[in-house]
Structures are given as C-alpha cells and as structure tokens.
C-alpha cells in the first residue's frame, strides 16, 4: 500500500459511533481496521516508516487501544514495549500524572523502572484529540529522564487542537479529520 494512500485506507476502515462514551462525543472505532490483516499491517508499516531499527529504545502504548498498535510497532523497531495505564492498573511502583480529556479528567501511570535515563521513546496511540493524554505521556517520559523522539497516531481530530499542545515536529498522524 503506497504511503500516500494510508490516510484514505485508515478513513475507509474506521467507523464513527455517536454519543460514545458520553453525549456529544463521536468515538472513532478502529476495530474494523484491526480486523483486516492487510490494513492493520499497512498501518503498522506506516507508523514505523519514519524510524530506523535501533533508533528507538522503547515504544509507549497508551491504554487501551494504543497497546494494540504500539506493540507491533515496538516489535518492528526492535524496541521494548511500555504500557501507560490508567491509575491503579499497574502492579509495581509508578510515576503518575493527571490531565484533562475531551470528556473529563484522568490519571495515567507508568512503572518507575519502565525507562532507563536517556532511553529514546516513541509514543503511539490511536487518536490525538485534545492532546492531554499525549502531553501527559511526555511528562511521564521526562520524569523518568528518558527522551521522547516522536508521537504517532492513527487518527488526529484536528478541530480539537491537540497538536498545538505538543511539540509539532514530533507529531505524526496517519489521518487528520
């Protein structure tokens, strides 16, 4: 699949779910994309395209759908996978930060030993909305003395302005809507 077509491919394989998880929110359901092996493979290939094997030490996946996409990205890059989870979901000591969501507030955590100082970290998630979750991920990476090298998303909801809260040069989205 040519890279120029990846946005169209993603758009053709997601569905909008109105009023989920709360009234006024249009949820971007990526499960149709995940169910098609060739489409899922093309998405993973597109997400790793800007990075060389060995240039990323850890790939962060943000709970929950970010896990699904980040793990194969980590595998392709020869990097470790690090889950960032909602508060109280990790079994070991954690670093945490709270942030605003499109529809409320949340806290995410990462294990205190998830990164080594200086680790080069790529953050992968399914959707960039307000940028709160991604900014929180960057904060946790910084707290751990690691270095974020990129933020990659399947879908960017441009109207919500999330890109403006993040280092613009680090943000890559396969589809901007």
From Swiss-Prot:
The lineage of its organism: Bacteria, Bacillati, Actinomycetota, Actinomycetes, Acidothermales. It catalyses: AMP + diphosphate = 5-phospho-alpha-D-ribose 1-diphosphate + adenine. One of its GO terms (molecular function) is AMP binding. This is Adenine phosphoribosyltransferase. InterPro entries: Ade_phspho_trans (IPR005764), PRibTrfase_dom (IPR000836), PRTase-like (IPR029057), UPRTase/APRTase (IPR050054). Homodimer. Its EC number is 2.4.2.7. It comes from Acidothermus cellulolyticus (strain ATCC 43068 / DSM 8971 / 11B). HAMAP family: Aden_phosphoribosyltr. It is an enzyme of class 2 (transferase).
